[in-house]
UniProtKB/Swiss-Prot annotation:
Residues 285-395 form the FAD-binding FR-type domain. Interacts with CYBA/p22phox. Heterodimerization with CYBA/p22phox is essential for its activity and cell membrane localization. NADPH oxidase that catalyzes the generation of superoxide from molecular oxygen utilizing NADPH as an electron donor, upon formation of a complex with CYBA/p22phox. Plays a role in the biogenesis of otoconia/otolith, which are crystalline structures of the inner ear involved in the perception of gravity. The chain crosses the membrane at residues 14-34, 52-72, 104-124, 168-188, 202-222, 396-416. The gene is NOX3. It comes from the Eukaryota. This is NADPH oxidase 3. It is a multi-pass membrane protein. Signal peptide: none annotated. The lineage of its organism: Eukaryota, Metazoa, Chordata, Craniata, Vertebrata. The keyword Cytoplasm does not apply. The keyword Glycoprotein applies. One of its GO terms (biological process) is superoxide anion generation. Glycans are attached at N163, N238. CDD domains: NOX_Duox_like_FAD_NADP.
Length: 568
Protein backbone atom coordinates (compact mmCIF):
# COMPACT_ATOMS: atom_id res chain seq x y z
CA UNK A 1 0.00 0.00 0.00
CA UNK A 2 2.82 2.40 0.85
CA UNK A 3 4.55 1.65 -2.44
CA UNK A 4 1.32 2.37 -4.33
CA UNK A 5 0.88 5.64 -2.44
CA UNK A 6 4.43 6.66 -3.35
CA UNK A 7 3.61 5.91 -7.00
CA UNK A 8 0.95 8.65 -7.08
CA UNK A 9 1.87 11.01 -4.26
CA UNK A 10 5.58 10.50 -3.64
CA UNK A 11 6.92 13.31 -5.81
CA UNK A 12 4.18 15.74 -4.68
CA UNK A 13 5.04 15.02 -1.06
CA UNK A 14 8.77 15.50 -1.72
CA UNK A 15 8.10 18.87 -3.37
CA UNK A 16 5.86 20.05 -0.51
CA UNK A 17 8.38 18.88 2.09
CA UNK A 18 11.12 20.68 0.16
CA UNK A 19 9.06 23.87 0.22
CA UNK A 20 8.45 23.48 3.95
CA UNK A 21 12.12 22.68 4.52
CA UNK A 22 13.27 25.82 2.71
CA UNK A 23 10.80 27.90 4.75
CA UNK A 24 12.00 26.41 8.03
CA UNK A 25 15.64 26.82 7.05
CA UNK A 26 15.18 30.47 6.04
CA UNK A 27 13.21 31.21 9.20
CA UNK A 28 15.57 29.49 11.65
CA UNK A 29 18.76 30.73 9.97
CA UNK A 30 17.51 34.34 9.87
CA UNK A 31 16.13 34.13 13.40
CA UNK A 32 19.45 33.06 14.90
CA UNK A 33 21.38 35.55 12.76
CA UNK A 34 19.40 38.45 14.20
CA UNK A 35 19.65 36.94 17.69
CA UNK A 36 23.44 36.77 17.51
CA UNK A 37 24.57 39.40 14.99
CA UNK A 38 26.73 41.99 16.73
CA UNK A 39 25.48 44.92 14.64
CA UNK A 40 21.96 44.41 16.02
CA UNK A 41 23.03 44.04 19.65
CA UNK A 42 21.73 47.47 20.69
CA UNK A 43 18.55 46.97 18.63
CA UNK A 44 17.90 43.79 20.64
CA UNK A 45 18.31 45.77 23.87
CA UNK A 46 15.20 47.73 22.90
CA UNK A 47 13.19 45.09 21.04
CA UNK A 48 14.29 41.78 22.49
CA UNK A 49 13.58 38.58 20.53
CA UNK A 50 10.66 40.09 18.58
CA UNK A 51 13.28 41.64 16.27
CA UNK A 52 14.31 38.15 15.15
CA UNK A 53 10.68 37.01 14.85
CA UNK A 54 9.87 39.99 12.61
CA UNK A 55 12.93 39.64 10.37
CA UNK A 56 12.72 35.84 10.01
CA UNK A 57 9.05 35.97 9.01
CA UNK A 58 9.83 38.84 6.61
CA UNK A 59 12.36 36.72 4.73
CA UNK A 60 9.90 33.82 4.49
CA UNK A 61 7.28 36.30 3.25
CA UNK A 62 9.64 37.44 0.50
CA UNK A 63 10.37 33.83 -0.48
CA UNK A 64 6.69 32.89 -0.72
CA UNK A 65 5.73 36.10 -2.51
CA UNK A 66 8.38 35.16 -5.07
CA UNK A 67 6.61 31.82 -5.62
CA UNK A 68 2.94 32.82 -5.49
CA UNK A 69 2.64 34.11 -9.08
CA UNK A 70 4.48 31.26 -10.81
CA UNK A 71 1.74 28.58 -10.43
CA UNK A 72 -0.84 30.93 -11.99
CA UNK A 73 1.34 31.80 -14.99
CA UNK A 74 -0.75 29.75 -17.40
CA UNK A 75 1.35 30.30 -20.51
CA UNK A 76 4.52 29.27 -18.69
CA UNK A 77 2.88 26.06 -17.44
CA UNK A 78 1.46 25.29 -20.89
CA UNK A 79 4.91 25.83 -22.41
CA UNK A 80 6.53 23.46 -19.89
CA UNK A 81 3.78 20.90 -20.45
CA UNK A 82 4.34 21.10 -24.21
CA UNK A 83 8.08 20.54 -23.78
CA UNK A 84 7.68 16.81 -23.16
CA UNK A 85 11.45 16.22 -23.34
CA UNK A 86 12.02 17.97 -19.99
CA UNK A 87 8.65 17.22 -18.42
CA UNK A 88 7.56 13.59 -18.36
CA UNK A 89 5.73 11.14 -16.13
CA UNK A 90 5.33 12.19 -12.49
CA UNK A 91 6.97 15.58 -13.11
CA UNK A 92 4.35 16.33 -15.75
CA UNK A 93 1.54 15.48 -13.33
CA UNK A 94 2.83 18.08 -10.87
CA UNK A 95 1.80 20.80 -13.33
CA UNK A 96 -1.82 19.78 -12.76
CA UNK A 97 -1.43 20.66 -9.08
CA UNK A 98 -0.44 24.25 -9.78
CA UNK A 99 -3.51 25.73 -8.06
CA UNK A 100 -3.01 23.50 -5.03
CA UNK A 101 0.57 24.76 -4.71
CA UNK A 102 -0.65 28.35 -5.25
CA UNK A 103 -3.03 27.93 -2.29
CA UNK A 104 -0.32 26.28 -0.18
CA UNK A 105 2.04 29.21 -0.78
CA UNK A 106 -0.81 31.61 0.03
CA UNK A 107 -1.23 29.91 3.41
CA UNK A 108 2.52 30.31 3.93
CA UNK A 109 2.19 34.03 3.20
CA UNK A 110 -0.74 34.33 5.62
CA UNK A 111 1.12 32.56 8.45
CA UNK A 112 4.32 34.55 8.04
CA UNK A 113 2.41 37.82 7.60
CA UNK A 114 0.61 37.15 10.89
CA UNK A 115 3.91 36.49 12.69
CA UNK A 116 5.44 39.60 11.12
CA UNK A 117 2.51 41.85 12.07
CA UNK A 118 2.30 40.61 15.67
CA UNK A 119 6.07 40.92 16.13
CA UNK A 120 6.10 44.49 14.82
CA UNK A 121 3.18 45.48 17.04
CA UNK A 122 5.31 44.40 19.99
CA UNK A 123 8.29 46.23 18.47
CA UNK A 124 6.28 49.43 18.10
CA UNK A 125 5.11 49.23 21.70
CA UNK A 126 8.69 48.63 22.85
CA UNK A 127 9.97 51.58 20.80
CA UNK A 128 7.26 53.78 22.28
CA UNK A 129 7.79 52.65 25.87
CA UNK A 130 11.56 53.13 25.54
CA UNK A 131 10.96 56.89 25.22
CA UNK A 132 9.01 57.03 28.49
CA UNK A 133 10.37 58.11 31.86
CA UNK A 134 10.08 54.51 33.05
CA UNK A 135 12.85 53.46 30.68
CA UNK A 136 16.19 53.56 32.50
CA UNK A 137 19.83 52.83 31.91
CA UNK A 138 21.09 51.62 28.53
CA UNK A 139 17.54 51.42 27.15
CA UNK A 140 16.95 55.13 27.79
CA UNK A 141 20.40 56.07 26.48
CA UNK A 142 19.82 54.23 23.20
CA UNK A 143 16.40 55.82 22.70
CA UNK A 144 17.83 59.33 23.20
CA UNK A 145 20.48 58.87 20.51
CA UNK A 146 19.88 61.20 17.58
CA UNK A 147 18.76 64.16 19.70
CA UNK A 148 22.10 65.92 19.22
CA UNK A 149 24.05 66.75 16.03
CA UNK A 150 26.31 64.11 14.46
CA UNK A 151 24.28 61.31 16.03
CA UNK A 152 22.13 58.77 14.19
CA UNK A 153 19.00 57.49 15.86
CA UNK A 154 18.18 53.90 16.73
CA UNK A 155 14.62 54.35 17.99
CA UNK A 156 12.29 55.61 15.20
CA UNK A 157 9.75 56.80 17.80
CA UNK A 158 11.27 60.13 18.78
CA UNK A 159 8.94 61.29 21.59
CA UNK A 160 6.78 59.63 24.22
CA UNK A 161 3.79 62.06 24.24
CA UNK A 162 2.21 60.33 21.23
CA UNK A 163 0.39 57.07 20.53
CA UNK A 164 1.45 54.02 18.58
CA UNK A 165 -1.26 54.47 15.93
CA UNK A 166 0.05 57.93 15.08
CA UNK A 167 3.60 56.63 14.92
CA UNK A 168 2.48 53.75 12.70
CA UNK A 169 0.89 56.11 10.18
CA UNK A 170 3.93 58.42 10.15
CA UNK A 171 6.23 55.84 8.57
CA UNK A 172 6.42 54.32 5.10
CA UNK A 173 6.69 50.88 6.68
CA UNK A 174 3.58 51.50 8.78
CA UNK A 175 1.37 52.78 5.96
CA UNK A 176 2.48 50.18 3.42
CA UNK A 177 2.26 47.46 6.06
CA UNK A 178 -1.34 48.45 6.73
CA UNK A 179 -2.12 48.41 2.99
CA UNK A 180 -0.43 45.01 2.57
CA UNK A 181 -2.40 43.58 5.50
CA UNK A 182 -5.75 44.87 4.20
CA UNK A 183 -5.00 43.60 0.69
CA UNK A 184 -4.05 40.18 2.04
CA UNK A 185 -7.22 39.93 4.14
CA UNK A 186 -9.36 40.89 1.12
CA UNK A 187 -7.67 38.36 -1.14
CA UNK A 188 -7.77 35.51 1.38
CA UNK A 189 -11.37 35.98 2.53
CA UNK A 190 -12.72 36.28 -1.03
CA UNK A 191 -10.87 33.13 -2.10
CA UNK A 192 -12.93 30.73 -0.01
CA UNK A 193 -14.83 28.06 -1.92
CA UNK A 194 -18.15 29.51 -0.73
CA UNK A 195 -17.35 32.97 -2.17
CA UNK A 196 -16.02 31.54 -5.44
CA UNK A 197 -19.19 29.54 -6.00
CA UNK A 198 -21.60 32.22 -4.80
CA UNK A 199 -19.95 35.15 -6.59
CA UNK A 200 -17.05 34.39 -8.90
CA UNK A 201 -17.03 38.08 -9.86
CA UNK A 202 -16.22 39.10 -6.27
CA UNK A 203 -13.38 36.58 -6.18
CA UNK A 204 -12.08 37.84 -9.55
CA UNK A 205 -12.09 41.54 -8.70
CA UNK A 206 -10.68 41.26 -5.18
CA UNK A 207 -7.90 38.99 -6.40
CA UNK A 208 -6.63 41.88 -8.50
CA UNK A 209 -5.79 43.71 -5.29
CA UNK A 210 -2.57 41.70 -5.63
CA UNK A 211 -1.26 44.63 -7.71
CA UNK A 212 -1.57 46.92 -4.68
CA UNK A 213 -0.11 44.15 -2.50
CA UNK A 214 3.07 43.80 -4.58
CA UNK A 215 3.56 47.53 -5.08
CA UNK A 216 3.30 48.12 -1.33
CA UNK A 217 5.59 45.18 -0.63
CA UNK A 218 8.25 46.57 -2.98
CA UNK A 219 8.43 49.91 -1.13
CA UNK A 220 7.68 48.57 2.36
CA UNK A 221 11.32 48.46 3.40
CA UNK A 222 12.39 51.79 1.91
CA UNK A 223 11.72 53.55 5.24
CA UNK A 224 14.52 51.43 6.80
CA UNK A 225 12.77 51.47 10.15
CA UNK A 226 14.74 48.52 11.56
CA UNK A 227 18.24 49.86 12.17
CA UNK A 228 21.52 48.27 13.12
CA UNK A 229 24.99 49.52 14.00
CA UNK A 230 27.19 50.37 11.01
CA UNK A 231 30.35 48.38 10.31
CA UNK A 232 32.52 51.49 10.69
CA UNK A 233 30.97 52.13 14.09
CA UNK A 234 31.52 48.53 15.15
CA UNK A 235 35.24 48.79 14.36
CA UNK A 236 35.55 51.79 16.71
CA UNK A 237 32.93 50.95 19.33
CA UNK A 238 33.58 47.65 21.13
CA UNK A 239 30.16 46.52 22.33
CA UNK A 240 31.47 44.13 24.99
CA UNK A 241 33.51 46.90 26.60
CA UNK A 242 31.20 49.86 25.97
CA UNK A 243 27.67 48.60 26.58
CA UNK A 244 27.97 48.99 30.36
CA UNK A 245 29.72 52.40 30.01
CA UNK A 246 26.91 54.14 28.12
CA UNK A 247 27.22 57.18 30.41
CA UNK A 248 30.82 57.67 29.20
CA UNK A 249 30.21 57.26 25.44
CA UNK A 250 30.92 60.91 24.74
CA UNK A 251 33.96 61.14 27.00
CA UNK A 252 35.86 57.84 26.65
CA UNK A 253 37.90 57.53 23.43
CA UNK A 254 37.37 53.76 23.22
CA UNK A 255 33.59 54.26 23.28
CA UNK A 256 32.46 56.78 20.68
CA UNK A 257 28.73 57.21 20.24
CA UNK A 258 27.49 54.25 18.13
CA UNK A 259 26.18 55.07 14.67
CA UNK A 260 23.20 53.30 13.12
CA UNK A 261 21.70 52.86 9.68
CA UNK A 262 18.67 51.09 8.25
CA UNK A 263 18.88 47.84 6.34
CA UNK A 264 18.56 48.18 2.57
CA UNK A 265 15.15 47.04 1.24
CA UNK A 266 15.32 43.62 -0.39
CA UNK A 267 11.71 42.58 -1.05
CA UNK A 268 11.79 44.00 -4.57
CA UNK A 269 14.74 41.78 -5.44
CA UNK A 270 12.71 38.68 -4.54
CA UNK A 271 9.57 39.59 -6.44
CA UNK A 272 10.98 41.41 -9.48
CA UNK A 273 11.46 38.28 -11.62
CA UNK A 274 8.02 36.72 -11.01
CA UNK A 275 6.28 40.09 -11.40
CA UNK A 276 7.98 40.64 -14.77
CA UNK A 277 7.04 37.09 -15.78
CA UNK A 278 3.41 37.65 -14.80
CA UNK A 279 3.41 41.02 -16.57
CA UNK A 280 4.43 39.15 -19.73
CA UNK A 281 1.45 36.84 -19.14
CA UNK A 282 -0.85 39.84 -19.09
CA UNK A 283 0.78 41.33 -22.19
CA UNK A 284 0.16 38.06 -24.03
CA UNK A 285 -3.44 38.13 -22.84
CA UNK A 286 -3.86 41.70 -24.09
CA UNK A 287 -2.37 40.72 -27.45
CA UNK A 288 -4.82 37.83 -27.72
CA UNK A 289 -7.63 40.15 -26.66
CA UNK A 290 -6.94 42.22 -29.77
CA UNK A 291 -7.25 39.21 -32.07
CA UNK A 292 -10.57 38.71 -33.82
CA UNK A 293 -12.81 35.84 -32.74
CA UNK A 294 -15.47 34.83 -35.28
CA UNK A 295 -18.59 33.20 -33.85
CA UNK A 296 -19.73 30.71 -36.50
CA UNK A 297 -22.60 29.00 -34.70
CA UNK A 298 -24.79 29.48 -31.63
CA UNK A 299 -26.87 26.61 -30.24
CA UNK A 300 -29.32 27.03 -27.37
CA UNK A 301 -29.93 23.60 -25.83
CA UNK A 302 -33.27 22.85 -24.11
CA UNK A 303 -31.43 22.24 -20.84
CA UNK A 304 -30.36 25.91 -20.62
CA UNK A 305 -26.87 25.37 -22.02
CA UNK A 306 -25.39 27.71 -24.61
CA UNK A 307 -23.08 26.16 -27.20
CA UNK A 308 -20.75 28.52 -29.06
CA UNK A 309 -18.70 27.59 -32.12
CA UNK A 310 -15.82 29.97 -32.84
CA UNK A 311 -12.83 30.46 -35.11
CA UNK A 312 -9.63 32.38 -34.51
CA UNK A 313 -6.54 32.72 -36.69
CA UNK A 314 -3.63 30.57 -35.51
CA UNK A 315 -5.69 28.83 -32.82
CA UNK A 316 -4.36 25.33 -32.07
CA UNK A 317 -5.74 23.08 -29.37
CA UNK A 318 -5.47 19.65 -27.79
CA UNK A 319 -8.30 17.64 -26.19
CA UNK A 320 -8.91 18.58 -22.56
CA UNK A 321 -7.60 22.13 -22.83
CA UNK A 322 -9.49 25.22 -21.71
CA UNK A 323 -9.71 28.88 -22.70
CA UNK A 324 -10.41 32.15 -20.93
CA UNK A 325 -13.34 34.08 -22.38
CA UNK A 326 -14.11 37.78 -22.02
CA UNK A 327 -17.21 39.60 -23.22
CA UNK A 328 -16.48 43.37 -23.17
CA UNK A 329 -20.21 44.13 -23.43
CA UNK A 330 -20.68 42.51 -19.99
CA UNK A 331 -17.35 43.34 -18.31
CA UNK A 332 -14.12 44.75 -19.68
CA UNK A 333 -12.06 43.10 -16.93
CA UNK A 334 -13.47 39.65 -16.24
CA UNK A 335 -12.07 36.52 -17.90
CA UNK A 336 -13.82 33.22 -17.22
CA UNK A 337 -12.43 29.71 -17.86
CA UNK A 338 -14.34 27.26 -20.07
CA UNK A 339 -13.28 23.82 -21.20
CA UNK A 340 -13.10 23.29 -24.94
CA UNK A 341 -15.69 20.76 -26.10
CA UNK A 342 -14.55 20.44 -29.71
CA UNK A 343 -11.88 18.09 -31.03
CA UNK A 344 -8.62 19.35 -32.60
CA UNK A 345 -9.65 17.67 -35.85
CA UNK A 346 -12.68 19.99 -36.24
CA UNK A 347 -12.35 23.30 -38.08
CA UNK A 348 -13.72 25.29 -35.15
CA UNK A 349 -13.43 25.37 -31.38
CA UNK A 350 -16.45 25.29 -29.09
CA UNK A 351 -17.52 25.75 -25.48
CA UNK A 352 -20.70 24.83 -23.62
CA UNK A 353 -21.81 27.43 -21.08
CA UNK A 354 -24.41 26.95 -18.36
CA UNK A 355 -25.69 29.83 -16.21
CA UNK A 356 -23.85 29.53 -12.89
CA UNK A 357 -23.41 33.16 -11.82
CA UNK A 358 -24.06 36.75 -12.82
CA UNK A 359 -21.58 36.79 -15.68
CA UNK A 360 -22.68 33.54 -17.33
CA UNK A 361 -26.35 34.48 -16.91
CA UNK A 362 -25.67 37.81 -18.62
CA UNK A 363 -23.80 36.04 -21.43
CA UNK A 364 -26.69 33.63 -22.08
CA UNK A 365 -29.08 36.57 -22.14
CA UNK A 366 -26.83 38.50 -24.54
CA UNK A 367 -26.85 35.54 -26.95
CA UNK A 368 -30.62 35.08 -26.65
CA UNK A 369 -30.47 31.73 -24.84
CA UNK A 370 -32.89 32.72 -22.07
CA UNK A 371 -36.12 32.03 -23.92
CA UNK A 372 -35.46 34.81 -26.42
CA UNK A 373 -34.85 34.53 -30.14
CA UNK A 374 -31.24 33.83 -30.99
CA UNK A 375 -29.37 36.87 -32.25
CA UNK A 376 -28.33 37.38 -35.85
CA UNK A 377 -24.58 36.78 -36.39
CA UNK A 378 -23.89 40.45 -37.09
CA UNK A 379 -25.57 41.52 -33.83
CA UNK A 380 -23.79 39.08 -31.50
CA UNK A 381 -21.62 40.61 -28.77
CA UNK A 382 -17.87 40.50 -29.30
CA UNK A 383 -15.88 37.85 -27.48
CA UNK A 384 -12.15 37.75 -26.68
CA UNK A 385 -10.33 34.46 -26.13
CA UNK A 386 -7.08 33.74 -24.28
CA UNK A 387 -5.49 30.31 -24.55
CA UNK A 388 -5.73 27.43 -24.94
CA UNK A 389 -4.14 26.15 -21.75
CA UNK A 390 -3.26 22.57 -20.89
CA UNK A 391 -4.73 20.45 -18.10
CA UNK A 392 -4.34 16.88 -16.86
CA UNK A 393 -6.69 15.53 -19.52
CA UNK A 394 -4.20 16.30 -22.30
CA UNK A 395 -2.16 13.31 -21.04
CA UNK A 396 -4.87 10.72 -21.78
CA UNK A 397 -3.13 9.46 -24.92
CA UNK A 398 0.06 8.71 -22.96
CA UNK A 399 -1.55 5.63 -21.36
CA UNK A 400 -2.65 2.32 -22.94
CA UNK A 401 -5.75 2.23 -20.73
CA UNK A 402 -7.70 5.16 -19.29
CA UNK A 403 -10.45 5.51 -16.72
CA UNK A 404 -12.35 8.78 -17.09
CA UNK A 405 -14.74 9.81 -14.32
CA UNK A 406 -17.04 12.83 -14.60
CA UNK A 407 -19.47 14.12 -11.98
CA UNK A 408 -22.14 16.71 -12.82
CA UNK A 409 -20.78 19.70 -14.73
CA UNK A 410 -17.38 17.96 -14.63
CA UNK A 411 -18.47 16.06 -17.73
CA UNK A 412 -17.65 19.05 -19.96
CA UNK A 413 -13.86 18.44 -20.31
CA UNK A 414 -14.50 14.92 -21.60
CA UNK A 415 -16.53 16.07 -24.61
CA UNK A 416 -13.44 17.07 -26.60
CA UNK A 417 -11.61 13.96 -25.43
CA UNK A 418 -14.29 11.53 -26.61
CA UNK A 419 -14.57 13.33 -29.95
CA UNK A 420 -10.80 13.23 -30.39
CA UNK A 421 -10.72 9.53 -29.54
CA UNK A 422 -13.29 8.90 -32.25
CA UNK A 423 -11.30 10.83 -34.85
CA UNK A 424 -8.07 9.06 -33.95
CA UNK A 425 -9.77 5.65 -34.10
CA UNK A 426 -11.19 6.50 -37.53
CA UNK A 427 -7.74 7.38 -38.91
CA UNK A 428 -6.10 4.01 -39.50
CA UNK A 429 -2.73 5.59 -40.24
CA UNK A 430 -2.62 7.38 -36.88
CA UNK A 431 -0.59 5.38 -34.29
CA UNK A 432 -2.52 5.26 -31.02
CA UNK A 433 -1.07 4.04 -27.74
CA UNK A 434 -4.50 4.22 -26.09
CA UNK A 435 -6.41 0.94 -26.58
CA UNK A 436 -9.24 1.07 -24.02
CA UNK A 437 -11.29 3.81 -22.35
CA UNK A 438 -13.63 3.36 -19.39
CA UNK A 439 -15.93 6.33 -19.03
CA UNK A 440 -18.05 6.92 -15.90
CA UNK A 441 -20.60 9.72 -15.80
CA UNK A 442 -22.35 10.45 -12.50
CA UNK A 443 -25.10 13.07 -12.57
CA UNK A 444 -28.15 14.06 -10.56
CA UNK A 445 -30.27 15.02 -13.56
CA UNK A 446 -29.24 13.83 -17.03
CA UNK A 447 -31.62 16.33 -18.64
CA UNK A 448 -29.29 19.14 -17.52
CA UNK A 449 -26.65 17.67 -19.86
CA UNK A 450 -28.75 16.54 -22.82
CA UNK A 451 -26.13 17.88 -25.19
CA UNK A 452 -23.58 15.41 -23.77
CA UNK A 453 -25.99 12.48 -23.99
CA UNK A 454 -26.49 13.41 -27.66
CA UNK A 455 -22.70 13.36 -28.11
CA UNK A 456 -22.47 9.89 -26.55
CA UNK A 457 -25.27 8.65 -28.79
CA UNK A 458 -23.45 9.94 -31.86
CA UNK A 459 -20.19 8.30 -30.75
CA UNK A 460 -21.96 5.04 -29.97
CA UNK A 461 -23.43 4.95 -33.48
CA UNK A 462 -20.12 5.75 -35.15
CA UNK A 463 -18.16 3.22 -33.07
CA UNK A 464 -20.71 0.56 -33.93
CA UNK A 465 -20.44 1.34 -37.64
CA UNK A 466 -16.64 1.06 -37.46
CA UNK A 467 -16.78 -2.19 -35.47
CA UNK A 468 -14.94 -0.63 -32.52
CA UNK A 469 -17.54 -0.87 -29.79
CA UNK A 470 -14.94 -2.56 -27.58
CA UNK A 471 -12.76 0.58 -27.49
CA UNK A 472 -15.09 2.69 -25.34
CA UNK A 473 -16.91 1.31 -22.32
CA UNK A 474 -19.20 3.88 -20.71
CA UNK A 475 -21.28 3.73 -17.54
CA UNK A 476 -23.87 6.38 -16.67
CA UNK A 477 -25.09 6.66 -13.08
CA UNK A 478 -28.18 8.72 -12.23
CA UNK A 479 -28.24 9.77 -8.57
CA UNK A 480 -31.51 11.73 -8.54
CA UNK A 481 -34.97 10.74 -9.76
CA UNK A 482 -38.61 11.04 -8.69
CA UNK A 483 -41.44 8.48 -8.51
CA UNK A 484 -42.77 9.32 -11.97
CA UNK A 485 -39.35 8.80 -13.50
CA UNK A 486 -38.92 5.51 -11.63
CA UNK A 487 -42.28 4.25 -12.93
CA UNK A 488 -41.44 5.35 -16.47
CA UNK A 489 -38.06 3.61 -16.28
CA UNK A 490 -39.62 0.37 -14.99
CA UNK A 491 -42.22 0.30 -17.78
CA UNK A 492 -39.59 0.67 -20.51
CA UNK A 493 -36.80 -1.42 -18.96
CA UNK A 494 -37.02 -4.21 -21.58
CA UNK A 495 -36.51 -1.87 -24.52
CA UNK A 496 -33.26 -2.02 -26.49
CA UNK A 497 -32.29 1.57 -25.70
CA UNK A 498 -32.16 3.45 -22.42
CA UNK A 499 -35.29 5.47 -21.69
CA UNK A 500 -33.29 8.40 -20.26
CA UNK A 501 -30.37 8.77 -22.68
CA UNK A 502 -31.45 6.79 -25.75
CA UNK A 503 -28.17 4.82 -25.58
CA UNK A 504 -27.82 1.05 -25.89
CA UNK A 505 -25.98 1.02 -22.57
CA UNK A 506 -28.58 1.22 -19.82
CA UNK A 507 -28.32 3.87 -17.12
CA UNK A 508 -27.49 2.71 -13.60
CA UNK A 509 -29.33 4.22 -10.65
CA UNK A 510 -27.36 5.17 -7.57
CA UNK A 511 -23.59 5.46 -7.26
CA UNK A 512 -20.79 3.21 -8.50
CA UNK A 513 -19.20 0.64 -6.24
CA UNK A 514 -15.67 1.80 -6.87
CA UNK A 515 -14.08 -1.21 -5.22
CA UNK A 516 -15.80 -3.52 -7.69
CA UNK A 517 -15.09 -1.24 -10.65
CA UNK A 518 -11.37 -0.90 -9.94
CA UNK A 519 -11.01 -4.57 -9.09
CA UNK A 520 -12.54 -5.54 -12.45
CA UNK A 521 -10.42 -3.05 -14.41
CA UNK A 522 -7.25 -4.29 -12.68
CA UNK A 523 -8.27 -7.87 -13.53
CA UNK A 524 -8.93 -6.96 -17.19
CA UNK A 525 -5.57 -5.21 -17.63
CA UNK A 526 -2.79 -6.89 -15.64
CA UNK A 527 0.68 -5.39 -16.03
CA UNK A 528 -0.78 -2.16 -17.48
CA UNK A 529 -0.26 1.50 -16.69
CA UNK A 530 -3.75 2.94 -16.29
CA UNK A 531 -4.42 6.67 -16.22
CA UNK A 532 -7.35 7.74 -14.05
CA UNK A 533 -8.74 11.18 -14.95
CA UNK A 534 -11.38 12.93 -12.87
CA UNK A 535 -13.32 16.18 -12.91
CA UNK A 536 -15.81 16.82 -10.13
CA UNK A 537 -16.23 17.34 -6.37
CA UNK A 538 -13.48 16.90 -3.79
CA UNK A 539 -15.19 14.08 -1.87
CA UNK A 540 -15.27 11.82 -4.92
CA UNK A 541 -11.72 12.86 -5.81
CA UNK A 542 -10.48 11.57 -2.46
CA UNK A 543 -12.32 8.27 -3.02
CA UNK A 544 -10.81 7.75 -6.47
CA UNK A 545 -7.37 8.67 -5.20
CA UNK A 546 -7.74 6.06 -2.49
CA UNK A 547 -8.83 3.45 -5.06
CA UNK A 548 -5.74 4.19 -7.16
CA UNK A 549 -3.53 3.58 -4.13
CA UNK A 550 -5.44 0.45 -3.11
CA UNK A 551 -5.48 -1.35 -6.45
CA UNK A 552 -2.04 -0.43 -7.76
CA UNK A 553 0.41 -3.29 -7.48
CA UNK A 554 3.62 -2.94 -5.49
CA UNK A 555 5.24 -5.16 -8.12
CA UNK A 556 6.79 -3.02 -10.91
CA UNK A 557 5.42 -5.57 -13.40
CA UNK A 558 1.88 -5.33 -12.04
CA UNK A 559 -1.00 -2.97 -12.73
CA UNK A 560 -0.54 0.69 -11.77
CA UNK A 561 -3.24 3.35 -11.52
CA UNK A 562 -2.01 6.94 -12.00
CA UNK A 563 -4.42 9.54 -10.63
CA UNK A 564 -4.95 12.86 -12.43
CA UNK A 565 -7.43 15.52 -11.33
CA UNK A 566 -8.73 18.20 -13.66
CA UNK A 567 -8.40 21.73 -12.26
CA UNK A 568 -8.44 25.19 -13.85
Amino acid sequence: MMGCWILNEGLSTILVLSWLGINFYLFIDTFYWYEEEESFHYTRVILGSTLAWARASALCLNFNCMLILIPVSRNLISFIRGTSICCRGPWRRQLDKNLRFHKLVAYGIAVNATIHIVAHFFNLERYHWSQSEEAQGLLAALSKLGNTPNESYLNPVRTFPTNTTTELLRTIAGVTGLVISLALVLIMTSSTEFIRQASYELFWYTHHVFIVFFLSLAIHGTGRIVRGQTQDSLSLHNITFCRDRYAEWQTVAQCPVPQFSGKEPSAWKWILGPVVLYACERIIRFWRFQQEVVITKVVSHPSGVLELHMKKRGFKMAPGQYILVQCPAISSLEWHPFTLTSAPQEDFFSVHIRAAGDWTAALLEAFGAEGQALQEPWSLPRLAVDGPFGTALTDVFHYPVCVCVAAGIGVTPFAALLKSIWYKCSEAQTPLKLSKVYFYWICRDARAFEWFADLLLSLETRMSEQGKTHFLSYHIFLTGWDENQALHIALHWDENTDVITGLKQKTFYGRPNWNNEFKQIAYNHPSSSIGVFFCGPKALSRTLQKMCHLYSSADPRGVHFYYNKESF
